[in-house]
Design a protein with these regions (language model features):
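An alpha-helical support segment within catalytic cores of ATP-dependent transferases
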Residues: 1-35, 45, 115-119
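N-terminal alpha-helical segment
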Residues: 2, 16, 62, 85-88
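A generic fold-level signal
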Residues: 24-26, 37, 61, 84
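Active-site Asp-x-Gly
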Residues: 31, 43-84
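Conserved short aromatic-hydrophobic micro-motifs
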Residues: 36-37, 92
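Anionic-ligand binding region
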Residues: 40
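Helix-rich C-terminal or lid/interface subdomains of diverse kinases
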Residues: 67, 74-120
């Protein structure tokens, strides 16, 4: 995927992002647009559909471009959830310190801490 500098993000945020991205392991890779859900990036004519504004394009997991409003791409619910979490993490990471990024990170579930059990 895209190389992102996570040094400005708080450590807990970095862990949440990395955990969200790791859930995409094994999914197909392709060139992704990076922002297909923005209606301003779609141009439709009677016989064609096109995406414009490819400045965020990169090679990554295909599911990232399939997180569309109302699950328009028809992903199964588990795949949609995984992709939505990873997408929110990516958006938070690429523009950290921006209010939008902070809101997107809030959508990424916290990493579950392992419980320690046993007897002494």
């Amino acid at each position: 995927g895209t190389r992102i500098d996570l040094s400005a993000m708080p450590p807990e945020g970095v862990m949440r992002c990395r955990a969200a991205w790791s859930r995409l392991s094994g999914r197909p890779t392709s060139v992704v647009h990076g922002n297909p859900a923005n209606p301003g990036n779609v141009r439709i004519t009677t016989d064609r559909v096109a995406l414009i504004d490819w400045d965020e394009a990169h090679v990554d997991k295909s599911d990232l471009d399939l997180v569309l409003p109302h699950n328009a791409a028809g992903l199964d619910s588990a795949s949609h959830d995984i992709a939505a979490q990873a997408s929110a993490a990516w958006e938070a990471a690429v523009c950290w310190k921006d209010d939008y990024a902070v809101r997107r990170l809030a959508e990424v579930r916290a990493v579950a801490k392992p419980s320690i059990s046993g007897t002494l």
